[in-house]
A protein has these predicted regions:
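Short, surface-exposed, charge-dense and proline/glycine-enriched linear segments
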Residues: 1-5, 45-55, 120-129
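Short, conserved beta-strand element in jelly-roll/cupin
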Residues: 1-13, 48, 72-75, 80, ...
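Short, flexible, glycine/charge-rich loop motifs used to bind or transfer phosphoryl groups or to couple energy/partner
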Residues: 9, 69, 91
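A cross-taxa feature marking solvent-exposed loop/turn segments within ectodomains of secreted
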Residues: 13-14, 96
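Double-stranded beta-helix
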Residues: 14-86
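Non-heme Fe(II)/2-oxoglutarate
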Residues: 34-38, 75-80, 84-139
């Protein structure tokens, strides 16, 4: 799985950029340190819709081994990253928006089997994208 993050607003060090632990995709699936109860109506994590399945100790160790990066850029920028790259964001405490659209193109036979977030955070629609005709915008 590859992910694309499209910045709809400028992303700066002040408005909570997504942080990445570079190279962690090479580790494959990192086993979670915690088990969360699910909220039935959302199928999400009970403690926090965007909570981490990893302890602070695990995250600290991985950052010490691999470093930490927080891509920033103007609206319209796109960041591509492997789905197994450890990533997350702090809350945006600034007065400036930080709207980012995440897109995860993937084969339909490789879909997520246990969604962890409500649709308003991560839409779980696994229908195949249907191609349009070449003249779809002019006809």
């Amino acid at each position: 799985v590859i992910n694309a993050a499209l910045f709809l607003d400028d992303v700066t060090e002040f408005n909570g950029p997504t942080m990445f632990v570079p190279g962690t995709h090479k580790l494959g699936m990192i086993p979670s340190d915690k088990n969360f109860d699910r909220i039935p109506e959302y199928g999400r994590l009970a403690e926090d819709a965007i909570g981490s399945p990893y302890t602070n100790e695990t995250i600290d160790r991985l950052i010490k081994e691999h470093g930490l990066a927080a891509p920033k850029g103007p609206a319209g920028s796109v960041v591509f990253f492997h789905g197994c790259t450890l990533h997350g964001s702090a809350p945006n405490m600034s007065p400036w928006n930080r709207t980012i659209v995440f897109w995860s193109p993937n084969r339909t036979d490789n879909k997520i089997t246990a969604p962890t977030r409500p649709d308003f955070l991560a839409l779980q629609d696994f229908e195949a994208v249907e191609p349009l005709t070449d003249d779809c915008l002019t006809s």
